[in-house]
From Swiss-Prot:
It catalyses: 2 reduced [nitric oxide reductase rubredoxin domain] + NAD(+) + H(+) = 2 oxidized [nitric oxide reductase rubredoxin domain] + NADH. SUPFAM superfamilies: FAD/NAD(P)-binding domain (SSF51905). It comes from Salmonella dublin (strain CT_02021853). This is Nitric oxide reductase FlRd-NAD(+) reductase. The lineage of its organism: Bacteria, Pseudomonadati, Pseudomonadota, Gammaproteobacteria, Enterobacterales. GO terms for molecular function: oxidoreductase activity, acting on iron-sulfur proteins as donors, NAD or NADP as acceptor.
Amino acid sequence: MSRGIIIIGSGFAARQLVKNIRKQDAHVPLTLIAADSMDEYNKPDLSHVISQSQRADDLTRQLAGEFAEQFNLRLFPHTWVADIDADAHVVKSQDKQWQYDKLVLATGATAFVPPIAGRELMLTLNSQQEYRACETQLRDAQRVLIVGGGLIGSELAMDFCRAGKTVTLMDNAASLLASLMPPEVSSRLQHHLTDMGVHLLLKSQLQKLEKTEAGIRATLVSQHSIEVDAVIAATGLRPETALARRAGVVVNRGVCVDSYLQTSHPDIYAIGDCAEINGQVLPFLQPIQLSAMYLAKNLLGGNAPLKLPAMLVKVKTPELPLHLAGETQRRDLSWHITAESDGMIAKGMSGEGQLRAFVVSEDRMKEAFALLKTLSV
């Protein structure tokens, strides 16, 4: 008798995988185990909850029980997996165990909180659960410090500013989105945030946080300090690899998988934010959707290597939206930038004259798909 497929996790990657499996096989036993409620919500919506006055419960799209009934699943919510015995094909919690034929790790990633004094005063917004824990504080806060000027930090800064809050955005780098693109490209967004009233503290590092009568005092390494009501860590995500380590599979930054989404153990796979696919961590929706399509085939006996085309990454900053694609982080590209009132096109060219990356904004985003077709990958 088939012991079926177990998926650990309940986020976007797990749900996409379930849907793709059920398109091909209505009956293979499917079990999902996760530490949260397993209710469905759209994680990117977390970047806009404050300006849209949404409570955590407003984000729920489908209850766990409805999902289980729709796709013929066994669900175990609020369940922490303690260990995996890869040789015996057994998943263990504190008081239960499950046998599997194939196991999929879809454990996601956790928000990194800088290891400074007072780090317990920092909030994170990496899940509906995390937002639920701090929504009252964030709604009531008037002065907000966001630590980290990457994708999420920039999105949150704009959202909190649109909600009428006093926002300070801090980053170690000299420009926003520094790990994604050069300053001459990100400067359009940077200037717009400044014009909106966001106070930028670039080339700045947080040293400590202290509770005061007036709120929270944030002290920088420079000894400059500011008083705020809430501090949000937007300093990146760390793939969740602890379970994979316990199972004895190879991990690096993420859970290492090949083009078949297979780990170093032949019956254990990984997908989504926790996975490192041939050396790349790709925590974006489109590669996860494609990964789910291919992994579903492979779990059901197929042998389909994942092929990822050039894909768009969308920066959800509504007043100055950006799309980017290609190797925008490369330092050896020559950038050709056309900036006009209706938007910007920035093309990153290699020494051989090939288009290796691009960033488009506002009304020029409609040109993104044509540029994708000419992108060298």
